[in-house]
Amino acid sequence: MTELKTLLPYLRPYRRAIGLGLSMVVLSNVFIIAGPYLLKLAIDGLGDPGRTRSDIAALAALIVLAALLGGAAKFWMREILNGTSRRIEADLRNDFFRHLLRLDVAFFGSTRTGDLMSRATNDTLAVRMAAGPAVMYAVNTTVSFAFSLALMVWISPRLTAVALVPMVILPPIVLGFGRIIHQKFEEIQEQFSTLSTMVQENLTGLRIVRAYVQEEDQERQFDALNADYMQRNLALVKASGLFHPLLMLLSGSAMVIALWYGGHQVISGRITIGDFIAFNFYLALLTWPMIALGWVVSLFQRGSASMGRLNRILETEPRIRPPTDPTPLHHVRGEIEFQEVSFRYPGTEREVIRGVSFVAGAGQTVAVVGPTGSGKSTLVSLLPRLYDPSHGRILLDGIPLTELDPLELRSVIGMVPQESFLFSETLRENIGLGVGLPPARALGSSAGRRPEDGSNPSREIERGYAPSGPDVPGKPEGRDERVEDAARVAQLHETILTFPKGYETVLGERGINLSGGQRQRATLARALARDPSILILDDALSAVDTHTEARILEDLKTALAGRTSFIISHRVTAVMNADRILVLDEGRVVEQGTHAELLARSGTYATLLRRQMLEEELEGGGGAVQEVGGVREGSLHG
């Protein structure tokens, strides 16, 4: 159970509450222990001629009072300690979530979402049970055992020694079953993670499941996983089911021995009837801790297994870390330089980017084209430091990216990824995500930093949410105006106005109630709304028809003016006006230059353009075709 040591920092802020709760544990046991002793005095007093009826009545009243005070102390014991464990659970879950946001993209590429969800829910619950009820009953069991045993020895040391003979084999039973329960519970949690992952994937990919008629196959897979989960739980039930009866057998044996030997003690006059009755009450109080011990051990073992699973995530350090003394960004010009940059994904040997070198001048538009799998998206993902190069370096305005705070770097970059992601909030909040005036609820935002230094998490969230300060270019004066202006550039404003609630339309999960093109335009508007110094469009218009694409590109000319931009597109016609075009093939820059320069070389770029023009001509049924630098181009408006 050494894993639970890492829970100590979470207990320290509540040490006063825990101390008060544990004092209630001791107090409740004092009152409970007093009851049998008062009963002994009353019974023994029945044969004493000097005792009056009022004396017996007074003892009876004290017994009732002790029971009431013991019950009140137990109530506050549970109220304080269980309430504290709930707060500890909330703190642990918050830290777990903050830590997840600190981790780099590579971590999530190798970790199942369902597994993380299981740790954030089931495992934190198991840790709470160990931090609250298990601690409470462990102390209660220890105190009750100590008080009861002390009074039993005081009544009759010999009877106590005989009655406790069955307890000799208790420690090895507890240790042995404790290890079994720990192992079984960890296996259950691992299987629950697998089960959660499958449910999450099926809910997310429900359209694919139905499109490929995979319902029955997925049901069979789920049934198999669920059956395995059930079998693992049944194995734990069997272990616990054997553990508790063994404890009951030991305690029952102790009671039988006490009745037999204690009866002889009364007959021989060594103890009184009151002593005998009180002894059996104390033995019963001793029996409950023995029975509860199995439950407490089970809770601690489950909590230990779950804390171990949480620790494996909490102890994972992000590969992308801010430098100790980061260089501040002032008046970003946007000059980007790649110097012999190579990259391979963690855990792989194949380089997907190989020796790439180029310079993007401040305010220039750089296009990246190439066949599928050539490394285009990977190349631009290195700019906001989603990954770090395996070799070489990237500079922003002459400063290596590794010398910059990643949060500050990302605050000046607007990125439109290939996969459009929208939150289950209003369109206004989605588009305004990076504007800097936080909505009622910061959508999925966080600093991604665990507040170990006692800082205010909400301030960290604001820092990760949007750029701030006088040195950040284009800080918005009005959030709504910026949102709507960005939507106009993305050709989405008029569409939004047709919705009954306009910008206040609440989106479904991942924006499912929008079309693919509308989702792409919304993510484009989100990037534009924050007015970044550097804009990255990763195939951002692939789901948009050519007519809408042409209008967006026309409006983007004004939006891109004065800012460095990187455009990835599978349509070569969308990047012909770029200041520099990079042609990637198998991770290498095989050509670079302007549109005219690359056409003149009749290389890979010219081949890609000819192929696409032919495809557009065939799709358009031989529609309008014009000559562009000696290459036939299908009209964007055709």
Segments and roles (model prediction):
Residues 63-70, 74, 167-171, 240-254, ...:
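Hydrophobic alpha-helical segments in the permease module
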Residues 13, 17-27, 133-188, 257-271:
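Transmembrane helices of ABC transporter permease
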Residues 323, 329-440, 444, 456-463, ...:
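ABC-type nucleotide-binding domain
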Residues 2-3, 11, 43, 77, ...:
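Juxtamembrane loop-to-helix connectors within ABC transporter transmembrane domains
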Residues 86, 94-118, 122-124, 197-221, ...:
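Short intracellular "coupling" helices and adjacent cytoplasmic loop segments at the cytosolic face
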Residues 18-73, 80, 153-158, 267-273:
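Transmembrane helix-loop-helix hairpins at lipid-water interfaces of multipass membrane proteins
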Residues 204, 214, 238, 286-313:
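Cytosolic ends of transmembrane helices, especially the final helix of ABC transmembrane type-1 domains
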Residues 13, 105-106, 122-131, 135, ...:
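An intracellular "coupling" helix at the cytosolic face of ABC transporter transmembrane type-1 domains
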